């Protein structure tokens, strides 16, 4: 991505010039503009993203915060805007008509597909687009990394393939190749973390996520991966701060419901059922299409004694899944992914999560 330098951008600060002219003069497609206002110890930061070709406003956000530590405040504002822009620019670029797409176009379209509500269809669409990108450019590190990450997400973590081992092996080979070409690429280290986490190698996955974050602290997917991996590895007390950091950095992220759900799971496994319900309900509100958000609520409601709502949520989870995954405890435990963690975490799942699902009416076999 071509980004104009700060000094050049500042030169337009006091000029009454339209965004279309700025775009033409600088040769840029998008303009980010904003302002900062102070009232006592409070700051209000306003920002908006504008398409310089059409003058259309694509995104806007207002952040209110205490001055406090100015350096920490600057980092948080930068992170939130960067994550929001990443989402908006991917969607905007992918929507542009192009009769002769190249590898980068297919990568953008694939990433846009990943921003859609998660489903077998959206994952399959993304895989197809990343495959096209890689076919057009076999040396593309981005195509290999995105394809590997999507293979892990769909075929392993979501249990939608009978070829889990083969797809995991393919993802492993792709990400090894990508990292050999770009050993400091943060997103590739994140995907490597996803791969080794799917292999049950939690400590190795933690190293990869931390490497990704050291290179790019704004990579919120790595915060999510690190948080869940800490949960699986048994370091439960470290999970909530990581997820709260992800929420602060990207509060409108399509994956924010996953982060809410992780915090809810921590509360459930530590027998704070009322708090778990609060966070699981936030997760359901953010992503009502995800069956596991309803499944988590089914367990939590049952543990709280609200069997009527527990039964309703279990039925909704099964309806959304459309398969046999949620038909029994045995099917759920056989889920082809690294969800139940190390022995300490598995024991907590058994005494809390699975106990709740049994109360909600999920049979053993």
Model-derived features with residue positions:
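TPR/TPR-like (Sel1-like) alpha-helical repeat modules
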Residues: 302-325
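Acidic, Ser/Thr-rich low-complexity linear motifs
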Residues: 94-97, 159-161, 323-341
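Acidic, proline/glycine-rich low-complexity intrinsically disordered segments
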Residues: 1-275, 279-282, 289, 294-303
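Terminal, low-structured helical/coil segments at or just beyond the last alpha-helical repeat
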Residues: 329-365
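A generic structural signal for well-ordered alpha-helical surface patches
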Residues: 295, 312-315, 351
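Short, compositionally biased low-complexity segments
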Residues: 52-53, 147, 321-330
């Amino acid at each position: 991505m071509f980004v104009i330098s700060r000094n050049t951008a500042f030169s337009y600060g006091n000029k009454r010039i339209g965004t279309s002219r700025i775009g033409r003069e600088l040769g840029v497609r998008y303009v980010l503009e904003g302002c900062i206002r102070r009232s006592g110890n409070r700051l209000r930061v306003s920002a908006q993203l504008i398409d310089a070709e059409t003058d259309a406003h694509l995104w806007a956000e207002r952040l209110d915060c205490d001055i406090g530590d100015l350096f920490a405040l600057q980092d948080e504002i930068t992170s939130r805007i960067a994550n929001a822009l990443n989402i908006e620019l991917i969607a905007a670029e992918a929507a542009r008509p192009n009769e002769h797409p190249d590898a980068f176009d297919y990568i953008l379209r694939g990433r846009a597909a990943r921003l859609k509500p998660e489903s077998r269809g959206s994952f399959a669409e993304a895989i197809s687009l990343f495959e096209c990108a890689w076919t057009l450019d076999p040396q593309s590190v981005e195509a290999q990394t995105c394809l590997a990450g999507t293979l892990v997400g769909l075929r392993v973590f979501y249990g939608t393939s009978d070829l889990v081992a083969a797809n995991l092996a393919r993802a492993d080979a792709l990400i090894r190749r990508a990292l050999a070409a770009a050993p400091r690429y943060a997103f590739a280290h994140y995907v490597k973390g996803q791969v080794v986490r799917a292999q049950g190698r939690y400590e190795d996955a933690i190293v990869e996520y931390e490497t990704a974050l050291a290179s790019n602290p704004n990579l919120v997917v790595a915060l999510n991966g690190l948080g869940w991996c800490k949960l699986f590895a048994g370091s439960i007390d470290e999970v909530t701060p990581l997820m709260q950091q992800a929420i602060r950095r990207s509060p409108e992220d399509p994956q924010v419901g996953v982060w809410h759900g992780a915090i809810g799971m921590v509360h459930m496994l530590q027998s704070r059922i009322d708090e778990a319900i609060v966070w699981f309900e936030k997760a359901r509100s953010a992503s009502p299409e995800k069956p596991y958000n309803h499944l988590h609520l089914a367990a939590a409601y049952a543990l709280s004694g609200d069997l009527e709502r527990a039964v309703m949520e279990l039925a909704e989870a099964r309806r959304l899944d459309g398969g046999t995954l949620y038909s029994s405890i045995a099917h759920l435990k056989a889920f082809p992914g690294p969800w139940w963690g190390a022995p300490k975490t598995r024991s907590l799942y058994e005494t809390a999560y699975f106990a709740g699902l049994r109360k909600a009416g999920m049979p053993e076999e």
